[in-house]
Regions:
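Short helix-loop capping/hinge motifs at secondary-structure junctions, enriched
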Residues: 126-133, 168-176, 263-273
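Extracytoplasmic/secreted proteins, especially bacterial periplasmic and envelope-associated proteins
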Residues: 33-40, 44, 68, 72, ...
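Ligand-binding pocket segment of bilobal, Venus flytrap-like solute-binding proteins
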Residues: 173-245
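Short beta-strand->loop
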Residues: 29-31, 143-186, 192-198
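Sec-exported extracytoplasmic/periplasmic mature domains
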Residues: 43-51, 78, 93, 100-101, ...
């Protein structure tokens, strides 16, 4: 063990010696839920002596709500948010699809998923029996009984992912990727519009989750990711919502890492950002994400909790960017 440690230290010194251009600060903007675990990964990367374009890259992680980041990236970056990022990791393709549509030249290559978390229904404990055997296909027609809130905004990827799952079910895709034409079809638009129109009012997913812990029956459920519900329930005792997994192919937040090619950053920043993504997706390096309740390739599923089973989920093939945008627009129009 002493020899291995010594070798690692020597490798680090050798790598540092090749950083002929010095250190390079590389900003990474991420969804707030990713901040803690990705800071741990960044510390490991920064200490590894990694060299990018003759620099020693130093990753700096900052949390920004995805709608705020999207507005800044598609418009003028606000310095109050921090330095311009070279890498953006939001919750889902809901955000990267819009960036790619607005400024395609600023997204370098295809974003890479660094983790995933399927959408579930967070259900009030007393209402749980009414959700037995429920399917994504059923949700629009049973909304009066199920009373599912469908918030939009910064923490509401669950709503948009649930919409993808429902759209695939009513569009009869059999788990295949939903196309833009299918997302705009009358049957899909009509089903989602009806589902949203009858939804209980709720400003945010966080507010809906809080409401589910209090007495009442106006609101019985809200779609969120597994990780979101597990994080909310942590340390709250028994009076928390429980996850229900509707039957059928299920969409997931995929935490896409998009390398950004902007005027304010250099090729060296882009290279370092891409190198960090590669490091993050190598076996074992994303363990902090798994420990935080995300599903990570090569890591065991998170441990079952009183609220979330983290069981087997039938995956839904990712929808096209055009379909994602169309479904978001449908849910936001109600």
């Amino acid at each position: 063990m002493v020899w291995l440690s010594g070798r690692s230290e020597q490798e680090g010194r050798d790598a540092a010696a090749s950083c002929v251009r010095g250190d390079l600060a590389v900003q990474v903007a991420v969804a707030p839920a990713l901040v803690g675990p990705l800071q741990r990964v960044a510390e490991s990367f920064n200490g590894s002596g990694a060299v990018s374009a003759d620099y020693c890259a130093k990753i700096e992680v900052m949390g920004i709500d995805s709608p705020v980041a999207l507005n800044a990236l598609t418009g003028t970056w606000d310095p109050k948010l921090g330095p311009v990022p070279s890498l953006w990791i939001p919750e889902s393709t809901v955000w990267t699809a819009r960036l790619a549509a607005a400024k395609p030249a600023e997204v370098s290559g295809q974003p890479t998923s660094v983790a995933s978390s399927p959408v579930v229904l967070a259900v009030r404990g007393s209402a749980r029996p009414g959700f037995d055997g429920v399917r994504w296909l059923d949700l629009p027609t049973r909304q009066e009984q199920l009373r599912i809130a469908l918030p939009t905004g910064a923490d509401a990827d669950g709503t948009y992912l649930a919409a993808q799952s429902v759209a695939a079910a009513v569009g009869r895709t059999a788990g295949a990727a939903l196309s833009e034409d299918a997302a705009k079809s009358p049957v899909v638009v009509g089903s989602l519009s009806r589902w949203g129109k009858d939804a209980p009012k709720s400003t945010t997913a966080g507010a809906a989750l809080e409401a589910l812990t209090r007495p009442g029956d106006v609101l019985r459920a809200v779609p969120v990711t597994e990780q979101q519900l597990a994080a909310f329930a942590r340390g709250r005792g028994d009076a928390v919502p429980v996850a229900v997994y509707p039957e059928g192919p299920t969409a997931a937040a995929t935490y896409p890492a998009a390398v950004l090619d902007r005027e304010e950053t250099t090729d060296a920043h882009d290279r370092a950002a891409a190198d960090f993504v590669t490091y993050l997706t190598e076996r074992g390096n994303a363990k902090p994400l798994a420990e935080a309740g995300f599903r990570v390739v090569g890591q065991p599923a998170p441990a079952k909790t009183a609220s979330v089973e983290f069981g087997t989920v039938e995956p839904l093939a990712p929808a096209s960017n055009g379909a994602v945008i169309s479904l978001v627009d449908t849910m936001n129009r109600r």
